[in-house]
Amino acid sequence: MANGTELRGIALEILLEITQEKEYSHLAIRNALNKVQYLPKQDRAFINRLVEGTLEYMLRIDYILNQFSSVRVNKMKPVIRNILRSGVYQLMFMDSVPDSAACNEAVKLAQKKGFYS
């Protein structure tokens, strides 16, 4: 079983491919999940749900982020923008993920990507 940061990192890479590289979501998800067949089915399902849910609610999530951030979503670095989007999705729509875990893993992922507070 992979750790939460690894799973969210895979989801982040998929989100970046879709939002930055303009890859079709179903193709990006399928290609990424094919590369991680070694992960348990439950972990791959988590990645899929996180990506699809973040994309489905992206407009709503961006609206929320704009209400609370001093930096507009469209001005954020793509990595940070997508970490925040997936974090907010987990907080709002994934009841199986504790709020503390969603926040902690978002911070860990940002640090792993080279962003420090």
Set out the residue ranges of the language-model regions:
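Class I Rossmann-like S-adenosyl-L-methionine
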Residues: M1-S117
